[in-house]
Amino acid sequence: MLVRRLTLLLLCLAFLAGPAWSASKDVIYASESTAKSLDPHDTTDTYSGAIEKAICQGLMGFDKDLKVIPLLAESYTFNPNATEFTFKLRKGIKFHDGTPFNAEAVRVNIARLMSGKLKRSSLMKPVKELVVVDEHTVKFVLNEPFGAFINAVAHPGALMLSPAALAKFGDAISKSPVGTGPFIFAEWASDTVKIKKNPDYWRGPVKVDTITFRPVPENGSRLAMLRAGQAQYIFPMPAELLKLAQADPKVEIIERPSIVERYLVFNTRYAPLADVRVRQAINYAIDKQAIIRIAWGGAASEADSIIPSNLQFYKKQGAWPYDVAKAKALMKEAGYENGFKVLFLTPNPSNRLRATEMVQQQLKEIGITGEIQSMDVASFYNKLEGHRADDPTPVPFIGFGGWSSSTGDADWGIRPLLATASFPPASSNFGFFSDKKVDELIQAGLATADPAVRREAYARCQETLWPLAPWGYLFVDNLLAAKSKNLKGIYPLPDGGFSVEEAELSE
């Protein structure tokens, strides 16, 4: 039935499309996600951030393996206490609107981040002041030692925007980004974003003319587009359709390990979910292996700590066992033997919706019931960000969440999601989890640049968090993408984003 449906989709796409794509070097990227904003300082989703990185650049960045590399800065130094970081800037670079990139441009961007009003302001929370040393040198002076600061500077949330464009557009910069990157923003029509080649790019022009990012949340439709030649790259590649894709001689599969962890967000302001025994019961009641196999096509591994295994300072805790009897006993002990109702929230890409449906069915076994509310990815995160800790009537939700620890450091896998200071709108602790000891250990991990001390702090933090079950622990993705064989140079990154700078399309 699924194969017949895909065949019909292919025929329809071929009919609607007319002639195949010409040699104008235009790439269509079909994704399950929808761009939420193109303001890097006010964006929290990985998909939007990856598009932003094609347009804008930071002082530092990451390579294919999430190792920190210099970009708009050519070098940096820091003092022994890790409280001062000095960056030498590249000369001769201009933003797409002709504005010079220099120390003043850095000052404007960092001041904006330090305002505390934006979703990525927490990246610059350690900064006391930014000193403009000269036209091509800046110095960050921190309030206290912050061992992960270089990783924070490399984060997509610290990309540089044109000061002139910021002055012109204000908050509307989210629909009109102006950076220094290999691509220039072209248009945002409906849910589709288009970028075009920057002919004056400081590292030399890219080899494609345009890239169009088109949201296609239904898995089969994405693959059908690729096979029909109406997309050259799709992400994610639906794992359940892998055999079908592999049989197509025009399609090439890409698989990479990721740092994207999937979990259930619990609104701990809702009394039943505030009880650690209930949260533990939910973890015992979820058959993670079944969800991985059926909803994720096997392209994942069970979470065995609060952060993925390829993050700096990870420490294995052991996957949470599947034990419905234990779950029922904990529900009874907590006084919820008869269960309670919740609202299941999820983005609508088919694998996430299927996973949420499976969670819904599994939790019925311990009396937790409720309807599913699905929506596009951007609306899902808007909804979570709209809740507040002091809401008079907390929404009893369980949400299908995901997080990419995109600095590559344990700090970014824990602090934005689980620190008390990270309640919305400050950051992404959407479940309002709060624990004093956890907060102290998070700060201990930031208080030094000494790797041994940081490792110990984050090990203790993971050990403390794991039994508290602030989330429903699920799994860590393997990244699956697919592309046409005449495209090269676009590849998925461990954080769930992608790189397009090396894109090349042959005849």
Language-model segments: residues:
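Gly/Pro-rich hinge or "lid" segments in bacterial periplasmic/extracellular proteins
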Residues: 154-206, 210, 220, 324-325, ...
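Alpha-helical secondary-structure segments
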Residues: 102-109, 135-141, 181-182, 208-210, ...
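Detector for C-terminal structural segments
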Residues: 27, 197, 285-313, 350-360, ...
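Aromatic- and charge-enriched surface segment that lines or borders ligand/interaction sites
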Residues: 74-117, 133, 139, 225, ...
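Surface-exposed binding/hinge segments that line
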Residues: 77, 88, 122-165
